[in-house]
């Protein structure tokens, strides 16, 4: 008999895949919550049955977005603890409690991390700063919001972030806190860099050498910031650091549907020898980044390997906890 997976797991997976749930932190918390619901609603009669359900649920969630490492790191956080309990001979209710509690713990730590990043990062923002940001990052927003709450007179330049327009979400959120916002097209980033004091952006993944994988366009903004000698600050929780890159694995860049760029009706009328490429992310080299702000403090990009060893060193010794 196959594992009975609750509908919330499939719904969450679909929302992550379609980008209804977007942003590395929200994706991670949604994945942890889906595992929690699976454990809560499971009709399993034996520990092995629940363990198998959680493994299948993890695989369904894992296969949704290849680039956002926050997703597998959330699954690892929960499943590593559940696996230890299962192999230790836990009974059904203990196993269920371990899954639910681990998921709640991850979600709590994730939300607290954003607050802490805001507190740490705001110390690097000065009164009168004009800040440029890209896409929609809760961690990056936390830095700007905290600085504004401290009474610093800041203004934020927000790029539209084509083709999914995440910049609109960022602009409206910052404005709701009372922060003055300038909204620009992506291609105007270099034009307005000369009036920018600092760049603050988020990350989907951070590699062992300190490179940042984030929304397409991030590397161009970081490059033009370097050209103008403008500080680039990346705000990211430690669960966005990519453990597999310690072993040389390359991060897969997700290619999304062309209809996100050109509406399907219009695309049908285009000549067949035009291809529309739509990468969701790009890679910003560590030399274009000045600091990475984490909940554990501010580090230079080359110190990313130290965070990875401390946080995920155990992951190098084992296969994924949901693998057979």
From Swiss-Prot:
EC number(s) stated in the UniProt entry for this protein: 5.3.1.29
Disulfide bonds: none
Matching Pfam families: IF-2B
Record's keyword terms, sorted: Carbohydrate metabolism, Isomerase
Binding residue positions for substrate: 22-25, 65, 137-139, 214-215, 240
Reaction equation(s) it catalyzes: alpha-D-ribose 1,5-bisphosphate = D-ribulose 1,5-bisphosphate
InterPro entries assigned: IF-2B-related, IF_2B-like_C, Initiation_fac_2B_a/b/d, M1Pi_N, NagB/RpiA_transferase-like, R15Pi
Active-site residue list: 135 (proton acceptor), 204 (proton donor)
GO biological process, any: pentose catabolic process
Any one GO molecular function term: S-methyl-5-thioribose-1-phosphate isomerase activity
NCBIfam families: eIF-2B_rel, ribulose_e2b2
Protein function: Catalyzes the isomerization of ribose 1,5-bisphosphate (R15P) to ribulose 1,5-bisphosphate (RuBP), the CO(2) acceptor and substrate for RubisCO. Functions in an archaeal AMP degradation pathway, together with AMP phosphorylase and RubisCO.
Misc note: Reaction proceeds via a cis-phosphoenolate intermediate.
Membership in a protein family: Belongs to the eIF-2B alpha/beta/delta subunits family. R15P isomerase subfamily.
Protein name: Ribose 1,5-bisphosphate isomerase
Organism classification: Archaea, Methanobacteriati, Methanobacteriota, Thermococci, Thermococcales
